[in-house]
Amino acid sequence: MDLSSLRPAKGAVKNKKRVGRGQGSGNGTTAGKGNKGQQARSGYKRPINEGGQIPVYRRLPKFGFTPIDRKSVTTVNLSQITRWIEQGLIENELGVIELKVLCHASNADYFKVLGNGEITAAVKITAHGFSKSAEAKITAAGGEAVTAVRTLEEAARVRDLAVEEALLKPKTKLVKRVKKNQKP
């Protein structure tokens, strides 16, 4: 076998359909486009127009909506955390910022730990959420599951605190200051 004997598979190469080359060819005159009108012309055709038939966007019902404040959640399984421990990337504590780095999630803001897999090392894990099974497995191994209150973006905006501390600090409600009327 050599390069000169290679051929494409049967049926893989088709001849180009040559249109507008005389009536005898079967595709002459109007070149298979019918008579006059928008669709006989070259260029743009309205993709929505279905020629009198109710178009698909009106045949199908409206469905659902997208909440504007939805948080995108990045999930991490216990099996992945165990792998990181075995590789020596984690020693005894795993914070939200380390999760962001280890997951290669540059725009992730909210992390949830799921209970798929087993964990044997006693590790303190800080994340925004834990499944019940993950929390049970972590505490059974002698570790600690700490729930972060703020997202990374919110924690970065807190003044006078490091990001790690701000993640755990509860949000305070704004208190409206009311001036008391002075008695005359």
UniProtKB/Swiss-Prot annotation:
HAMAP family: Ribosomal_uL15 (MF_01341)
Compositionally biased spans, kind Gly residues: 21-35
Disulfide bonds: none
Keyword entries, A-Z: Ribonucleoprotein, Ribosomal protein, RNA-binding, rRNA-binding
SUPFAM superfamilies per record: Ribosomal proteins L15p and L18e
PANTHER family found in the cross-reference section: 50S RIBOSOMAL PROTEIN L15 (PTHR12934), LARGE RIBOSOMAL SUBUNIT PROTEIN UL15M (PTHR12934:SF11)
One GO cellular component term: cytosolic large ribosomal subunit
Functional note: Binds to the 23S rRNA.
Transmembrane segments: none
One GO BP annotation of this record: translation
Gene Ontology MF terms in the entry: rRNA binding; structural constituent of ribosome
Chain spans, region Disordered: 1-50
UniProt family annotation: Belongs to the universal ribosomal protein uL15 family.
Subunit structure: Part of the 50S ribosomal subunit.
Name of the protein in its database record: Large ribosomal subunit protein uL15
